[in-house]
Amino acid sequence: MAGTVAERDAPKIEDGHLNNSLGSPVQADVYFPRLIVPFCGHIKGGMRPGKKILVMGIVDLNPESFGISLTCGESEDPPADVAIELKAVFTDRQFIRNSCVAGEWGEEQSSIPYFPFIPDQPFRVEILCEHPRFRIFVDGHQLFDFYHRIETLSAIDTIKINGDLQLTKLG
């Protein structure tokens, strides 16, 4: 075989793009390449069971919040469906998740065992797509599950990131 699944799905930087699955060039920085926030990138082939999105960054020194969303396209008018929106809110120490289908936001979920983000510190968020749900890991620890509210996983083809953070890696 030509390598394991992990080797084939591992993020690779080629021609300034990450694994050709997220289509936004890396901002050139001699010592530490950073991705520009707000960020919007294409997920090649959309989501499917077994696919993982990796977001690594550093929380700003005095953050209010930051968000990571997986959406069905980039449309603003009408707004694209949001399969999952993750929002870290530092004032309330909450990691909120929700979705928006056909312009209607669902029931917000906010219970977490602990708040994993620290100002001015690096973090690693992994969004693992499984058949019935997204499984969210922060710094290697499973934090919660979010059950799909959008049926066609392959339509989830865009990642958007904004707020008080610096991105260091996407894959």
From Swiss-Prot:
GO terms for molecular function: carbohydrate binding. It comes from Gallus gallus (Chicken). The lineage of its organism: Eukaryota, Metazoa, Chordata, Craniata, Vertebrata. This is Galectin-related protein. Residues 38-170 form the Galectin domain. The keyword Kinase does not apply. Pfam families: Gal-bind_lectin (PF00337). CDD domains: GLECT. Does not bind lactose, and may not bind carbohydrates.
